[in-house]
Structure formats: structure tokens, C-alpha cells
Amino acid sequence: MFIQMIQGPCTRQDEARQLLDEWRRDLAPGATGWLGGTNGFTDDGQLIGVVRFESREAAMANSNRPEQGEWAAKMAEVMDGPMEFHDCDDVTLLFDGGSDDAGFVQIIRGRVDDPSRLKAMMTTDTTQLHEMRPEILGGTLAIEADGSFIETVAFTNEADARKGEQIEPPEDVRRELDYAMQGATYYDLHRPWFESA
């Protein structure tokens, strides 16, 4: 799997949402290898999209379509500033990945010097995590070449997510969390929406 994260300031949110809906309706059918996406606006007006493709080649082929270029130009017009793009070939799934049933999504951006340690945290003893935090439906961990990461976590709802945050994990888990999340930035999507192929 390949993940591209797109982020930028946007106060014209209704227009941006309409354009994203147009992409789903008109362009997605021709986007070979497109798997889906998670989108939302943060409280401070950032539009975030986490888009999944089968491979980098599929994502690049989509970017090179003329109709994609035309759509991107329209999208740029409703943004308040330039958009950031982050491309990640290194993707790890938490449980079965994200969930289109999520009522709340948290995007975490950070950087680690040992990505394998972070990936191990996502895949080791997920049974214990599921028992401790049943409100977590799944997620994806996307890592860039420099160790920067984008973790997307899907929750049943925000109230249960906040309650779950108060649960103190075992000491070894706490140690790994402290390592991974040191200096990380959290983006809350209170009203996320989803697209799937």
C-alpha cells in the first residue's frame, strides 16, 4: 500500500468538500489502484486528506492524468495557502486498517530515528490493545524516508476516545508511546468523511 497525505489551510470548507465529492464521483472511477481516503477539517481550519493507493506507481499515474491536473488547479483556488504533500511507501496497518464507520479520527505527525520500533508497536500484541482500547477501530502508519510518520487512527466516537486516553497502559507500552510520540503533533477530525473504492 502507498499513502499520500495532503494538508493545507482552508476556510472555504463547503467548496473544498464539494470538490472532493466531485473527485469521488467523476475522477475516482478512472483512478487505477486508488483504494480510498480519510478526510476532514481541523478546528484551526486545516484540510487533511489521507489517500490510499495500491502502489506509488498507481498514485503517480493518477497525478499525471490531465483531468487530475485540472481538478487540482480548482482545488488550489479554494485553499488559503499552499498544500503540503507527503508520500509514503512504508505503510503498516493497525488491525485491518482504518474504518469508514469511525465517528472520530486522529492524525498524528511525528518523527522517529528507528521506524522499525514504531512499526513493532503497531503490530505486537494487538489483542491486548483491542481489549484495553475497544474504541479504536483501526489505523494506518505511514513512514517517510527520513523517519517522519503519519499515523491515522479511527475511533468509534470522540467521547470514547477521550475516555480511552485516560487509561494508563502497561509500563513497557508507555515507554514505547513516549518514544514514538515525543514532539508529535495531533490533528483531530471531529467530523471525518471517508471514500472507498
Where are the language model's segments positioned?
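Short S/T/G/P-rich N-terminal loop/turn motif that feeds into the first structured element of a domain
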Residues: M1-I48, R52-A197
